[in-house]
């Protein structure tokens, strides 16, 4: 089975229209196989035609064709007379399918239909100049990757991109958004070599009971830094991490002797504490279920009351204990290399609590820069109002200000 660590951090969701939230919750119930809750959201007419068992049969037939479900990869809304139709793209191990959910005026599910998904093409952000760099295939410890190289004689500064939690591809695709592709193309348009690669848990069938942070993230990141250091067209090497990847970049930089670190939305607290705050936030918006049960598990993890090999919240308990021992702020404090930290003011996953820890440990140092963009969310995409996981289903791009700040900082 593929490992999907339970990190709402890393759950994804959008500021809703009329029934966006209800439609998304219905699909969440369906994809998490909570068929009774899904049926309860349906209109009386639909309930007369469907049962819990029939919903289960429909879902299992999809899995039989497409293997394990992975994520909700995006959606669009269509208004049709008195109905709102939501087209959700569902990603499985062996392909994608569209789930069309029809909502009536009362916010009840009035229809459900599945069809083959149509693939959407990646659109270049305005800040990308595709003529200014070239992209080549590369492998990192056997993992497929890409390296984008500016045109010209060089040498150039270079950076390795380290993913957030879960089985991410090289583009760090979240819904319809490709965070690392935006960053790679944006930075290479400004004279920086960028190396990105598929995360090991994206490529391999991993036994989650044997998973470690070292094997999942750090080993491959160290190899990626080594690859860049051996290139003649590279002047210096940076490590850039997002979310959980940002949490680990100080250790990766220290062990690889990198020349600098960029941390985008880096947690500073233990994972259980970050998840607890996320869960309570989502509960306040009506977007979380089984809250008390999950909070109880998180509390036990904090006290290390769960046996290390016991599987909880998508990972063995020892995975959480391992992360807890890696204190990123303390490691960063002893580093002497330049560091750039970027936060989104609308980020509900990595919050002011984390910012305050980083500020306490690193403020006052001339080679450390900390930026907060008030309108950006966890993905560094701009928006308004409260951020939710469904926001991540809306197509956008990493904000130009983030790209510009990173490029200026690396090139100077």
UniProtKB/Swiss-Prot annotation:
Biotech relevance: The high thermal stability and activity in the presence of organic solvents makes EstD an attractive catalyst for future applications in industry.
Regulation: Is strongly inhibited by phenylmethylsulfonyl fluoride, a serine protease inhibitor, and by mercury chloride. Diethyl pyrocarbonate, a histidine modifier, also inhibits the reaction, albeit less pronounced than phenylmethylsulfonyl fluoride. EDTA and dithiothreitol have no effect on enzyme activity.
InterPro entries to which the protein is assigned, alphabetical: AB_hydrolase_Est10, AB_hydrolase_fold, DUF3887, Esterase_EstD, Hydrolase_4
Mutation effect (residue 243 to A): Loss of enzymatic activity
Keyword match Hydrolase: yes
Keyword Hydrolase: yes
Temperature dependence: Optimum temperature is around 95 degrees Celsius. Shows >70% of its maximal activity in the pH range of 5-9. Displays a relatively high thermostability with a half-life of 1 hour at 100 degrees Celsius.
UniProt effect for mutating residue 378 to N: Loss of enzymatic activity
Catalytic activities: a carboxylic ester + H2O = an alcohol + a carboxylate + H(+)
EC number: 3.1.1.1
Signal peptide range in chain numbering: 1-20
Gene Ontology terms for molecular function: carboxylesterase activity; carboxylic ester hydrolase activity
UniProt entry keywords in alphabetical sequence: Hydrolase, Serine esterase, Signal
Leading EC class: hydrolase
pH dependency: Optimum pH is 7.
Active-site residues, record numbering mapped to chain: 243 (nucleophile), 347 (charge relay system), 378 (charge relay system)
Biological function: Exhibits significant esterase activity with a preference for short acyl chain esters (C4-C8) in vitro. Its physiological function is not known. Displays neither proteolytic activity using casein as substrate, nor peptidase activity when assayed with L-leucine p-nitroanilide and L-proline p-nitroanilide.
Subunit structure: Exists mainly as a monomer and, to some extent as a dimer.
Family per similarity comment: Belongs to the AB hydrolase superfamily. Esterase 10 family.
PANTHER family named in the record: ESTERASE ESTD
Name of the protein this chain belongs to: Esterase EstD
The gene coding this protein: estD
